Amino acid sequence: MKQYLDLMKKVLEEGTAKDDRTGTGTRSIFGHQMRFNLQEGFPLVTTKRCHLRSIIHELLWFLNGDTNIKYLHDNGVSIWDEWADENGDLGPVYGKQWRAWGSADGRHIDQLTQVLEQLKGDPDSRRIIVSAWNVGELDKMALAPCHAFFQFYVADGKLSCQLYQRSCDVFLGLPFNIASYALLVHMMAQQCNLDVGDFVWTGGDTHLYNNHLEQTHLQLSREPRALPKLVIKRKPDSLFDYRFEDFEIVDYDPYPGIKAPVAI
């Protein structure tokens, strides 16, 4: 994950001081891309321990179309707590948009099911896309989508994915985002009988919060270790039937975790 550390260093050295919605302040660059060959290992940051349980359960929660934090709480995940209302609801965030995008004529469009059908029936299509950026519902969301738009691409029997992330918290959020979408590519590839290719991450406003700078310097002092491997223990009947226990990360040898406050 040297490219992740290189990005942190770039933001520190070249970033512009900017105000932000949370009032914390950031150092920010605009427009950055990283490519991870998923054949070479699972891109889980090793220079600090990442909470894999949260990554997996959050993705399963998205895939189920859920927008209430009860499932997350039931599974020991608290990463969405700060944005939920008193009933645990977040409004029409990722799960709603991925699984039940509301059309102008009143239909609910299951974008993920459509993508699976395209990958199996028309893998050369240039329209294999999922968007969470529903302009008509942004004002109802507890938090506008940060990872907003992703596209799949099939070549030589391998499935690749590119994500556009309009806003990126490099220290806290980005390791989760990279691992989450890499996991999704593995799941999609298994369902479509494809090998995994690349995960391409593209960032818009790519920033370090001012209260994460000390932690960033600590992380940059650590030498990256070998990437772990992902094992999927079974092939469910559909993308929506995976369970937490289906996944195992082997040979993950990270440095200790580094705590940092979340900007809300």
From Swiss-Prot:
Keyword Transferase in annotation: yes
Coiled coil: none
Oligomer status and interactors: Homodimer.
Stored CDD domains: TS_Pyrimidine_HMase
Gene designation per UniProt: thyA
Gene3D superfamilies: Thymidylate synthase/dCMP hydroxymethylase domain (3.30.572.10)
Residues at the catalytic site: C146 (nucleophile)
Subcellular location: Cytoplasm
Record lineage: Bacteria, Pseudomonadati, Pseudomonadota, Gammaproteobacteria, Enterobacterales
Residues that bind (6R)-5,10-methylene-5,6,7,8-tetrahydrofolate: H51, D169, A263
Binding site for dUMP: R21, R126, R127, R166, S167, C168, D169, N177, H207, L208, Y209
Known role: Catalyzes the reductive methylation of 2'-deoxyuridine-5'-monophosphate (dUMP) to 2'-deoxythymidine-5'-monophosphate (dTMP) while utilizing 5,10-methylenetetrahydrofolate (mTHF) as the methyl donor and reductant in the reaction, yielding dihydrofolate (DHF) as a by-product. This enzymatic reaction provides an intracellular de novo source of dTMP, an essential precursor for DNA biosynthesis.
Family: Belongs to the thymidylate synthase family. Bacterial-type ThyA subfamily.
Highest taxon above the source species: Bacteria
GO CC annotations, alphabetized: cytosol
One Gene Ontology biological process: dTTP biosynthetic process
Name listed for the protein in its UniProt record: Thymidylate synthase
Source organism: Xenorhabdus nematophila (strain ATCC 19061 / DSM 3370 / CCUG 14189 / LMG 1036 / NCIMB 9965 / AN6)
